[in-house]
Amino acid sequence: MSGNILVLGGSQFVGPAFIRLLQSKKYSVSVLNRGSKPVEGTTQLIADRNDKAAMQQHAGTHYDAVIDLSCYNAPQAQIAWETFSEDADRWVYLSTIAVYEDTPLPTEEAGIESAAYWGGYGKGKAAADAYVLGQSGPPLVILRPPYLYGPENHIDRERFVWRHALAGKPIAIPGDGTALVQFLHIEDLATALFLAMTTENLTYNVFNVAGKEQMT
């Protein structure tokens, strides 16, 4: 199977891992971002996604799927949707578990108000989720991963722990040390994005994607 895919974002961490998977399966990939870090083997579209006029200069091309990896708030979601949804056969939006309100035990009914400790990031992503879920158009799939790790991570997360461990420095534990978190390897997220893009007749359109293991 092959097709024409548009990736919004795509220049850091998640994008390159997902694009490599698409290229291995012979998809034609266009990448839309500010163009500061071109992705080899793709068609580069340059626009600031906050600029509706700049985005709409790239409208009108049919895509088998639009994969939105770089949306952080409702205005960005709206500009992208209004620009590309009419020409897309499917829309995959990368969200985050940070959209969930603080609950003792997660449930299918958990709201997307975002816990206070996520600050503006969680609130912005929750608003973007609410926007795309309220639209009619191509089939929509939303993935909500937890903390990501793996090669080319630009966030100083696992490297911080390894540096301290190798140097024999103490590693601070947030809070009282009882909080449980889950992680997801970047290649597993790339696979999940691909399945969200290609799987037909899904029963649900919002999925939490995480590793099985919980840790403090």
Task: Indicate where each model-derived feature is located.
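SDR active-site strand-loop-helix element
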Residues: 8, 32, 69, 94-96, ...
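Rossmann-fold cofactor-recognition segment
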Residues: 41-51, 70-72
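N-terminal Rossmann NAD(P)H-binding glycine-rich loop of SDR-like oxidoreductase domains
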Residues: 5-25
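Short amphipathic alpha-helix with an adjacent loop that forms part of the alpha/beta core around
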Residues: 52-61
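Conserved beta-loop-beta element that borders a ligand/cofactor-binding pocket
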Residues: 129-152
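N-terminal Rossmann-fold cofactor-binding loop
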Residues: 32-36, 48-49
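Alpha-helical substrate-binding/gating segment
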Residues: 162-172, 179-214
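NAD(P)-cofactor binding segment of oxidoreductase domains
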Residues: 61-112, 116, 123-131
